[in-house]
Amino acid sequence: MTHQTHAYHMVNPSPWPLTGALSALLMTSGLIMWFHFNSTTLLMLGLTTNMLTMYQWWRDVIRESTFQGHHTPNVQKGLRYGMILFIISEVLFFTGFFWAFYHSSLAPTPELGGCWPPTGIHPLNPLEVPLLNTSVLLASGVSITWAHHSLMEGNRNHMLQALFITIALGVYFTLLQASEYYEAPFTISDGVYGSTFFVATGFHGLHVIIGSTFLIVCFFRQLKFHFTSSHHFGFEAAAWYWHFVDVVWLFLYVSIYWWGS
């Protein structure tokens, strides 16, 4: 690398944005193939290429930040702004789903029987699995905060314990959500209720899986002593993302499960 007299990281050309975009195309196309033709080949190919891209891109970022020291305070500031803008874009993404839900439920059309939930739909009891899911995610919000405070205080063991608990709760939430989908008395094709329910909660579930993956990477990085109390933006970004997932679930629970039932 040539000598530089500024504090900014000039990133080398990378193939991972392109392979990431192609894997996203394969996954979305694969999802359509699965829904319409019951074939999972394309979906599996997309998931495989996505996981390979994630591994190699994360490897590059860890090398540049932890081992080459490219993540100066100026670079970290830019990354913080980037993460904040990303979370704002995700908020707007979910706003679209809530808009669709309230548009359909506040003024039900005659086709829906003029009522909400529509005639023939038996909604899930909000005081059963959904309430358990809420308590699981709230507990994970507490444990990720504990992990962050432990890291700031230099208590590595407590940080690892808290991070492990958060990951376990995230996996538990995903399993509960999967069992709920399996046992639900309606499907994604059951009119606007099924569509809004499964798309909104499904995309949230996808975000929980992404957040859990992010935290697992942080866990293995901390096992290798990558984070210090003053240099840990990778973990901080994961914590912000997890809190965002937490808050979105509270809105989903109150809107779709509790009020919508």
UniProtKB/Swiss-Prot annotation:
Catalytic activity: 4 Fe(II)-[cytochrome c] + O2 + 8 H(+)(in) = 4 Fe(III)-[cytochrome c] + 2 H2O + 4 H(+)(out)
Domain of life: Eukaryota
UniProt entry keywords in alphabetical sequence: Membrane, Mitochondrion, Mitochondrion inner membrane, Translocase, Transmembrane, Transmembrane helix
Membrane topology (Mitochondrial intermembrane): 35-40, 106-128, 184-190, 257-261
Residue ranges annotated as Mitochondrial matrix topological domain: 1-15, 67-72, 153-155, 224-232
GO cellular component: mitochondrial inner membrane; respiratory chain complex IV
Membrane topology: Multi-pass membrane protein
InterPro entries: Cyt_c/ubiquinol_Oxase_su3, Cyt_c_oxase_su3_dom, Cyt_c_oxidase-like_su3, Cyt_c_oxidase_su3-like_sf, Cyt_c_oxidase_su3_a-hlx
GO biological process: mitochondrial electron transport, cytochrome c to oxygen; respiratory chain complex IV assembly
Record-listed E.C. numbers: 7.1.1.9
UniProt entry tagged with the keyword Transmembrane helix: yes
Compartments in which it is found: Mitochondrion inner membrane
Consequence of changing residue 192 to I: In subsp. Gazella
TM stretches of this protein: 16-34, 41-66, 73-105, 129-152, 156-183, 191-223, 233-256
Example GO molecular function: cytochrome-c oxidase activity
Function description: Component of the cytochrome c oxidase, the last enzyme in the mitochondrial electron transport chain which drives oxidative phosphorylation. The respiratory chain contains 3 multisubunit complexes succinate dehydrogenase (complex II, CII), ubiquinol-cytochrome c oxidoreductase (cytochrome b-c1 complex, complex III, CIII) and cytochrome c oxidase (complex IV, CIV), that cooperate to transfer electrons derived from NADH and succinate to molecular oxygen, creating an electrochemical gradient over the inner membrane that drives transmembrane transport and the ATP synthase.
Family assignment from sequence similarity: Belongs to the cytochrome c oxidase subunit 3 family.
Assembly and binders: Component of the cytochrome c oxidase (complex IV, CIV), a multisubunit enzyme composed of 14 subunits. The complex is composed of a catalytic core of 3 subunits MT-CO1, MT-CO2 and MT-CO3, encoded in the mitochondrial DNA, and 11 supernumerary subunits COX4I, COX5A, COX5B, COX6A, COX6B, COX6C, COX7A, COX7B, COX7C, COX8 and NDUFA4, which are encoded in the nuclear genome.
Entries under PANTHER family matching the protein: CYTOCHROME C OXIDASE SUBUNIT 3 (PTHR11403:SF7), CYTOCHROME C OXIDASE SUBUNIT III (PTHR11403)
Stated name of the protein: Cytochrome c oxidase subunit 3
Gene: MT-CO3
